[in-house]
Amino acid sequence: YGICKNEEKFIDTWYNSVKEADAIYVLDTGSTDNTVELLKKLEKVEVTVAKIDPWRFDTARNKSLNLVPEDFDICVCQDFDEVFKEGWRKELEDHWSTSTTRARYNYNWSLDNNDKPIVSFYIDKIHQRKNYKWTHPVHEVLTYTGSDKENMITIDTITLNHYPDQTKSRSNYLPLLELSIKES
């Protein structure tokens, strides 16, 4: 599942990365390009359009998570500028158990021109369907809400690469960061 807005140039690469999933749920938050039309043509993709006002990333992510049926066991949140290395699904199935609540895996936030990682760390956007919500208006965090102990596993054989769109403005981030501080 994921959120998008004006991502038509990333759709093919993104889809080739996520198509191992059983179903793909996307919340479009107001694209003015061909994103929605292109997504509707893809197998297994269900796209919903919704305006988020006032804009917050956590609200958008929670609305996209709510598109995933309650009976799904595992949710994988992926942005359109992120690409899983092939075989992620098999690795996930090989490591996930019925007691797992979340998985942590490799995230290459910055890569050089030869796809060698410059900045890498663990990320944990794979989780069970229930007992999770996104918090914070920007640089949102997946928060466990269950009453039982969270059981996070680490899967070093899953890697997600980040290829950010350098042309997109991040000017709205500062007010969202300020709001996040006020809410803390």
Predicted regions and their residues:
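Short, well-formed alpha-helical segments that are part of the catalytic scaffolds
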Residues: 2-23
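Conserved donor nucleotide-binding strand/loop of the catalytic core
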Residues: 37-67
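A short acidic, amphipathic alpha-helical/loop segment
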Residues: 13-17, 38, 63, 90-91
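Acidic helix N-cap motif at the loop->helix transition within catalytic regions
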Residues: 9-12, 33-41, 87
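A conserved acidic beta->alpha catalytic loop
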Residues: 17, 27-38, 52-54, 79-80
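Structural beta-sheet core signal
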Residues: 2, 26, 102-104
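Receiver (REC) domain switch/active-site residues of two-component response regulators
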Residues: 22-23, 45, 73
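Catalytic-site signature of metal-activated, phosphate-bearing donor transferases
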Residues: 57-66, 72, 78, 83-184
